[in-house]
Amino acid sequence: MAKTVYIAGLGLIGASMALGIKRDHPDYEILGYNRSQASRDIALKEGMIDRATDDFASFAPLADIIILSLPIKQTISFIKELANLDLKEGVIISDAGSTKSAIVDAAEQYLAGKPVRFVGAHPMAGSHKTGAASADVNLFENAYYIFTPSSLTGKDTLEEMRDLLSGLHARFIEIDAKEHDRVTSQISHFPHILASSLMEQTAVYAQEHEMARRFAAGGFRDMTRIAESEPGMWTSILLSNRETILDRIEDFKERLDDVGQAISKGDEEQIWNFFNQAREQRQAMEIHKRGGVDSSYDLYVDVPDEEDVVLRILELLRGTSLVNIHINEENREDIHGILQISFKNAQDLERAEHLITENTDYTVVIK
Protein backbone atom coordinates (compact mmCIF):
# COMPACT_ATOMS: atom_id res chain seq x y z
CA MET A 1 0.00 0.00 0.00
CA ALA A 2 1.33 3.43 -0.95
CA LYS A 3 2.49 5.63 1.91
CA THR A 4 3.05 9.32 2.47
CA VAL A 5 6.58 10.20 3.56
CA TYR A 6 7.48 13.63 4.91
CA ILE A 7 11.13 14.68 4.74
CA ALA A 8 11.95 17.81 6.71
CA GLY A 9 15.21 19.22 5.39
CA LEU A 10 16.03 19.05 1.68
CA GLY A 11 19.79 19.33 1.92
CA LEU A 12 22.18 16.74 0.52
CA ILE A 13 21.05 13.98 2.91
CA GLY A 14 17.30 14.64 2.82
CA ALA A 15 17.13 15.13 -0.94
CA SER A 16 19.30 12.07 -1.65
CA MET A 17 17.08 10.06 0.69
CA ALA A 18 14.03 11.19 -1.28
CA LEU A 19 15.62 9.95 -4.50
CA GLY A 20 16.41 6.58 -2.93
CA ILE A 21 12.87 6.17 -1.64
CA LYS A 22 11.45 7.08 -5.05
CA ARG A 23 13.70 4.48 -6.70
CA ASP A 24 12.11 1.53 -4.89
CA HIS A 25 8.73 3.10 -4.09
CA PRO A 26 7.68 5.25 -7.06
CA ASP A 27 4.06 5.14 -5.87
CA TYR A 28 4.86 6.73 -2.50
CA GLU A 29 4.00 10.40 -2.07
CA ILE A 30 6.96 12.34 -0.74
CA LEU A 31 6.36 15.67 0.94
CA GLY A 32 9.24 18.05 1.61
CA TYR A 33 9.93 20.87 4.02
CA ASN A 34 12.69 23.43 3.64
CA ARG A 35 13.02 27.07 4.57
CA SER A 36 14.86 27.82 1.34
CA GLN A 37 12.65 28.45 -1.68
CA ALA A 38 15.55 27.50 -3.96
CA SER A 39 15.91 24.06 -2.36
CA ARG A 40 12.18 23.44 -2.57
CA ASP A 41 12.13 24.44 -6.24
CA ILE A 42 15.05 22.16 -7.10
CA ALA A 43 13.51 19.20 -5.27
CA LEU A 44 10.20 19.68 -7.07
CA LYS A 45 11.75 20.26 -10.49
CA GLU A 46 13.96 17.16 -10.24
CA GLY A 47 11.08 14.98 -9.06
CA MET A 48 12.61 14.27 -5.66
CA ILE A 49 9.39 15.26 -3.91
CA ASP A 50 5.76 15.67 -4.91
CA ARG A 51 4.81 18.66 -2.75
CA ALA A 52 6.79 21.23 -0.76
CA THR A 53 6.23 23.67 2.07
CA ASP A 54 8.06 26.16 4.27
CA ASP A 55 5.56 25.55 7.10
CA PHE A 56 6.71 22.42 8.92
CA ALA A 57 3.49 21.80 10.83
CA SER A 58 1.28 21.89 7.73
CA PHE A 59 2.33 18.53 6.23
CA ALA A 60 3.11 16.58 9.42
CA PRO A 61 -0.49 15.34 10.02
CA LEU A 62 -0.58 13.87 6.49
CA ALA A 63 2.43 11.61 6.89
CA ASP A 64 2.79 7.91 7.63
CA ILE A 65 6.53 8.41 8.13
CA ILE A 66 8.34 11.62 9.11
CA ILE A 67 12.10 11.95 8.68
CA LEU A 68 13.85 14.94 10.26
CA SER A 69 16.97 15.59 8.18
CA LEU A 70 17.96 18.72 10.04
CA PRO A 71 20.64 20.15 12.36
CA ILE A 72 20.49 18.63 15.83
CA LYS A 73 19.01 21.65 17.64
CA GLN A 74 16.33 22.05 14.98
CA THR A 75 15.55 18.33 15.09
CA ILE A 76 14.89 18.54 18.83
CA SER A 77 12.80 21.68 18.32
CA PHE A 78 10.66 19.93 15.69
CA ILE A 79 10.22 16.88 17.94
CA LYS A 80 8.73 19.22 20.54
CA GLU A 81 6.46 20.67 17.85
CA LEU A 82 5.35 17.23 16.66
CA ALA A 83 4.26 16.40 20.22
CA ASN A 84 1.58 19.09 19.94
CA LEU A 85 0.26 18.17 16.49
CA ASP A 86 -2.60 15.85 15.55
CA LEU A 87 -0.54 13.16 13.82
CA LYS A 88 -1.66 9.89 12.26
CA GLU A 89 -1.89 7.10 14.81
CA GLY A 90 1.19 4.90 14.62
CA VAL A 91 3.19 7.37 12.52
CA ILE A 92 6.92 6.62 12.46
CA ILE A 93 9.19 9.54 13.31
CA SER A 94 12.91 9.26 12.60
CA ASP A 95 15.86 11.57 12.08
CA ALA A 96 19.26 11.73 10.40
CA GLY A 97 21.35 13.42 13.09
CA SER A 98 25.05 12.74 13.60
CA THR A 99 24.67 12.36 17.36
CA LYS A 100 21.91 10.31 18.88
CA SER A 101 21.60 10.50 22.67
CA ALA A 102 20.26 14.06 22.83
CA ILE A 103 17.74 13.39 20.06
CA VAL A 104 16.54 10.05 21.45
CA ASP A 105 16.25 11.56 24.94
CA ALA A 106 14.18 14.43 23.55
CA ALA A 107 11.88 12.03 21.70
CA GLU A 108 11.33 9.90 24.81
CA GLN A 109 10.62 13.03 26.83
CA TYR A 110 8.26 14.89 24.50
CA LEU A 111 6.59 12.04 22.58
CA ALA A 112 5.93 9.74 25.55
CA GLY A 113 2.27 8.79 25.76
CA LYS A 114 1.59 9.87 22.17
CA PRO A 115 0.30 7.33 19.60
CA VAL A 116 3.54 7.57 17.62
CA ARG A 117 6.70 5.54 17.10
CA PHE A 118 10.23 6.93 17.12
CA VAL A 119 13.55 5.45 16.04
CA GLY A 120 16.77 7.43 15.92
CA ALA A 121 18.91 7.08 12.82
CA HIS A 122 22.24 8.18 11.41
CA PRO A 123 23.02 7.59 7.73
CA MET A 124 26.83 7.61 7.67
CA ALA A 125 27.27 9.13 4.25
CA GLY A 126 28.16 12.55 3.00
CA SER A 127 30.04 14.65 0.51
CA HIS A 128 31.92 17.92 0.30
CA LYS A 129 28.96 19.10 -1.78
CA THR A 130 25.81 20.43 -0.12
CA GLY A 131 22.20 21.21 -0.89
CA ALA A 132 19.43 19.67 -2.95
CA ALA A 133 21.29 20.47 -6.17
CA SER A 134 23.96 17.94 -5.12
CA ALA A 135 21.51 15.13 -4.31
CA ASP A 136 22.74 11.70 -5.39
CA VAL A 137 20.60 8.56 -5.46
CA ASN A 138 23.77 6.51 -4.85
CA LEU A 139 25.01 8.59 -1.91
CA PHE A 140 24.22 5.88 0.66
CA GLU A 141 25.32 2.87 -1.38
CA ASN A 142 27.18 0.42 0.90
CA ALA A 143 27.30 3.03 3.67
CA TYR A 144 26.15 2.21 7.18
CA TYR A 145 22.66 3.41 8.04
CA ILE A 146 22.55 3.19 11.82
CA PHE A 147 19.31 2.83 13.77
CA THR A 148 19.26 3.65 17.48
CA PRO A 149 15.97 2.20 18.81
CA SER A 150 14.21 3.86 21.72
CA SER A 151 11.46 2.95 24.16
CA LEU A 152 9.08 4.38 21.54
CA THR A 153 10.30 2.31 18.61
CA GLY A 154 7.65 -0.38 18.85
CA LYS A 155 7.06 -3.60 16.97
CA ASP A 156 7.87 -3.84 13.24
CA THR A 157 9.17 -0.25 13.11
CA LEU A 158 12.68 -1.20 12.00
CA GLU A 159 11.34 -3.60 9.38
CA GLU A 160 9.14 -0.83 7.97
CA MET A 161 12.07 1.59 7.89
CA ARG A 162 14.32 -0.91 6.12
CA ASP A 163 11.61 -1.46 3.53
CA LEU A 164 11.12 2.28 3.08
CA LEU A 165 14.84 2.87 2.63
CA SER A 166 15.65 -0.21 0.55
CA GLY A 167 16.37 1.96 -2.48
CA LEU A 168 19.28 3.59 -0.67
CA HIS A 169 21.25 0.32 -0.94
CA ALA A 170 22.73 1.03 2.47
CA ARG A 171 23.85 -1.40 5.17
CA PHE A 172 21.44 -1.22 8.10
CA ILE A 173 22.67 -1.78 11.63
CA GLU A 174 21.25 -1.25 15.13
CA ILE A 175 23.15 0.18 18.08
CA ASP A 176 22.35 1.82 21.41
CA ALA A 177 22.25 5.64 21.16
CA LYS A 178 24.87 6.22 23.85
CA GLU A 179 27.22 3.63 22.36
CA HIS A 180 26.71 5.25 18.96
CA ASP A 181 27.87 8.57 20.37
CA ARG A 182 30.88 6.98 22.07
CA VAL A 183 31.96 5.23 18.86
CA THR A 184 31.41 8.19 16.53
CA SER A 185 33.19 10.55 18.93
CA GLN A 186 36.36 8.52 18.31
CA ILE A 187 36.13 7.71 14.60
CA SER A 188 34.29 10.78 13.29
CA HIS A 189 33.93 13.72 15.66
CA PHE A 190 37.42 13.76 17.18
CA PRO A 191 39.16 13.34 13.79
CA HIS A 192 37.42 16.53 12.64
CA ILE A 193 38.94 18.34 15.62
CA LEU A 194 42.37 16.95 14.75
CA ALA A 195 42.08 17.92 11.08
CA SER A 196 40.99 21.46 11.87
CA SER A 197 43.65 21.86 14.58
CA LEU A 198 46.38 20.67 12.21
CA MET A 199 45.13 23.05 9.53
CA GLU A 200 45.01 25.99 11.94
CA GLN A 201 48.47 25.17 13.30
CA THR A 202 49.93 24.93 9.80
CA ALA A 203 48.33 28.20 8.67
CA VAL A 204 49.95 30.03 11.60
CA TYR A 205 53.29 28.25 11.07
CA ALA A 206 53.25 29.12 7.36
CA GLN A 207 53.21 32.83 8.20
CA GLU A 208 56.89 32.47 9.16
CA HIS A 209 57.69 29.41 7.04
CA GLU A 210 56.09 30.18 3.70
CA MET A 211 57.21 26.97 1.97
CA ALA A 212 54.96 24.94 4.29
CA ARG A 213 52.02 25.87 2.07
CA ARG A 214 53.80 24.78 -1.10
CA PHE A 215 55.04 21.47 0.25
CA ALA A 216 51.70 20.47 1.81
CA ALA A 217 50.39 17.55 -0.27
CA GLY A 218 49.86 13.81 -0.07
CA GLY A 219 49.50 12.79 3.56
CA PHE A 220 48.80 16.34 4.73
CA ARG A 221 46.03 16.71 2.18
CA ASP A 222 44.48 13.40 3.22
CA MET A 223 44.62 14.27 6.92
CA THR A 224 43.12 17.74 6.55
CA ARG A 225 40.47 17.13 3.88
CA ILE A 226 37.66 17.08 6.44
CA ALA A 227 38.75 20.47 7.78
CA GLU A 228 36.67 21.88 4.90
CA SER A 229 33.47 20.58 6.52
CA GLU A 230 30.58 22.93 7.30
CA PRO A 231 31.40 24.70 10.61
CA GLY A 232 27.83 25.16 11.81
CA MET A 233 27.07 21.47 11.58
CA TRP A 234 30.23 20.50 13.44
CA THR A 235 29.70 23.06 16.17
CA SER A 236 26.29 21.49 16.76
CA ILE A 237 27.73 17.96 16.76
CA LEU A 238 30.47 18.73 19.28
CA LEU A 239 28.16 20.54 21.67
CA SER A 240 25.60 17.73 21.58
CA ASN A 241 28.25 15.11 22.44
CA ARG A 242 30.58 17.21 24.58
CA GLU A 243 31.40 14.87 27.49
CA THR A 244 32.40 11.97 25.26
CA ILE A 245 34.45 14.19 22.96
CA LEU A 246 36.22 15.87 25.89
CA ASP A 247 37.16 12.39 27.12
CA ARG A 248 38.70 11.60 23.72
CA ILE A 249 40.65 14.87 23.75
CA GLU A 250 42.14 14.11 27.19
CA ASP A 251 43.02 10.57 26.11
CA PHE A 252 44.77 11.89 23.00
CA LYS A 253 46.74 14.45 25.01
CA GLU A 254 48.17 11.61 27.11
CA ARG A 255 49.14 9.62 24.01
CA LEU A 256 50.75 12.66 22.41
CA ASP A 257 52.69 13.33 25.61
CA ASP A 258 53.96 9.73 25.56
CA VAL A 259 55.28 10.16 22.02
CA GLY A 260 56.85 13.49 22.94
CA GLN A 261 58.64 11.93 25.91
CA ALA A 262 59.93 9.06 23.75
CA ILE A 263 61.34 11.55 21.25
CA SER A 264 62.86 13.64 24.05
CA LYS A 265 64.57 10.57 25.54
CA GLY A 266 65.69 9.33 22.13
CA ASP A 267 63.90 6.03 22.79
CA GLU A 268 64.22 4.47 19.34
CA GLU A 269 62.45 1.25 20.32
CA GLN A 270 59.39 3.02 21.73
CA ILE A 271 59.13 5.27 18.67
CA TRP A 272 59.46 2.30 16.31
CA ASN A 273 56.81 0.38 18.25
CA PHE A 274 54.52 3.41 18.13
CA PHE A 275 54.54 3.50 14.34
CA ASN A 276 54.57 -0.26 13.87
CA GLN A 277 51.59 -0.86 16.16
CA ALA A 278 49.63 1.87 14.39
CA ARG A 279 50.42 0.34 11.01
CA GLU A 280 49.39 -3.15 12.11
CA GLN A 281 46.22 -1.88 13.79
CA ARG A 282 45.18 0.05 10.70
CA GLN A 283 45.79 -2.94 8.46
CA ALA A 284 43.64 -5.07 10.76
CA MET A 285 40.69 -2.67 10.76
CA GLU A 286 37.86 -2.85 8.24
CA ILE A 287 38.83 0.65 7.21
CA HIS A 288 39.26 -0.31 3.55
CA LYS A 289 35.69 -1.60 3.35
CA ARG A 290 33.15 1.01 2.33
CA GLY A 291 30.61 1.98 4.94
CA GLY A 292 31.56 5.29 6.39
CA VAL A 293 31.12 8.93 5.69
CA ASP A 294 32.09 10.33 2.32
CA SER A 295 32.79 6.93 0.83
CA SER A 296 34.49 6.91 -2.56
CA TYR A 297 36.42 4.33 -4.50
CA ASP A 298 39.82 5.59 -5.59
CA LEU A 299 41.99 4.32 -8.39
CA TYR A 300 45.51 5.63 -9.02
CA VAL A 301 47.18 5.41 -12.42
CA ASP A 302 50.87 6.00 -13.11
CA VAL A 303 50.69 7.71 -16.48
CA PRO A 304 53.53 9.13 -18.58
CA ASP A 305 53.88 12.85 -19.19
CA GLU A 306 52.50 12.67 -22.72
CA GLU A 307 50.01 14.71 -24.68
CA ASP A 308 46.37 13.52 -24.49
CA VAL A 309 47.11 10.75 -21.96
CA VAL A 310 44.28 11.89 -19.66
CA LEU A 311 41.93 12.13 -22.63
CA ARG A 312 42.82 8.54 -23.55
CA ILE A 313 41.93 7.34 -20.06
CA LEU A 314 38.63 9.21 -20.13
CA GLU A 315 37.78 7.71 -23.52
CA LEU A 316 38.34 4.23 -22.08
CA LEU A 317 36.02 5.07 -19.18
CA ARG A 318 33.23 6.49 -21.33
CA GLY A 319 29.91 5.48 -19.75
CA THR A 320 31.41 5.06 -16.27
CA SER A 321 30.24 7.47 -13.58
CA LEU A 322 33.20 9.42 -12.15
CA VAL A 323 33.00 11.29 -8.85
CA ASN A 324 36.26 13.19 -9.30
CA ILE A 325 39.50 13.21 -11.24
CA HIS A 326 42.69 14.74 -9.90
CA ILE A 327 46.18 15.13 -11.34
CA ASN A 328 48.90 14.94 -8.69
CA GLU A 329 51.54 17.42 -9.79
CA GLU A 330 54.19 16.28 -7.30
CA ASN A 331 56.03 12.99 -7.64
CA ARG A 332 55.93 11.97 -3.97
CA GLU A 333 56.38 8.67 -2.18
CA ASP A 334 53.07 9.05 -0.33
CA ILE A 335 51.05 9.44 -3.54
CA HIS A 336 50.05 6.21 -5.27
CA GLY A 337 49.90 7.51 -8.83
CA ILE A 338 49.93 10.59 -10.99
CA LEU A 339 46.25 10.36 -11.93
CA GLN A 340 43.66 9.81 -9.18
CA ILE A 341 40.14 8.86 -10.28
CA SER A 342 37.30 8.50 -7.76
CA PHE A 343 34.16 6.43 -8.27
CA LYS A 344 30.97 6.12 -6.24
CA ASN A 345 30.67 2.33 -6.25
CA ALA A 346 32.79 -0.80 -6.44
CA GLN A 347 31.34 -1.91 -9.77
CA ASP A 348 32.55 1.22 -11.58
CA LEU A 349 35.94 0.97 -9.87
CA GLU A 350 36.42 -2.66 -10.95
CA ARG A 351 35.27 -1.89 -14.48
CA ALA A 352 37.71 1.00 -14.73
CA GLU A 353 40.60 -1.08 -13.42
CA HIS A 354 39.86 -3.79 -15.98
CA LEU A 355 39.57 -1.35 -18.90
CA ILE A 356 42.79 0.49 -18.09
CA THR A 357 44.90 -2.62 -17.42
CA GLU A 358 43.57 -4.40 -20.53
CA ASN A 359 44.10 -1.47 -22.88
CA THR A 360 47.26 0.19 -21.54
CA ASP A 361 50.53 -0.71 -19.89
CA TYR A 362 50.00 1.82 -17.08
CA THR A 363 50.38 0.71 -13.47
CA VAL A 364 47.04 0.81 -11.64
CA VAL A 365 46.68 0.87 -7.84
CA ILE A 366 43.42 0.66 -5.90
CA LYS A 367 43.39 2.36 -2.52
Language-model segments: which ranges?
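Interdomain hinge/lid region at the active-site interface
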Residues: E208-F275
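A conserved regulatory-domain signal marking ACT and ACT-like small-molecule sensing domains
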Residues: Q281-K367
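NAD(P)+-binding Rossmann beta1-loop-alpha1 motif at the extreme N-terminus of oxidoreductases
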Residues: M1-P61
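Small-residue-rich helix-loop
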Residues: D267-M285, K289
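Internal alpha-helical scaffold of NAD(P)-dependent oxidoreductase catalytic cores
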Residues: L139-I226
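Rossmann-like NAD(P)(H) cofactor-binding subdomain of soluble oxidoreductases
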Residues: K80-A132
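Rossmann-like NAD(P)-binding element
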Residues: A57-D86, V91-I92, S98
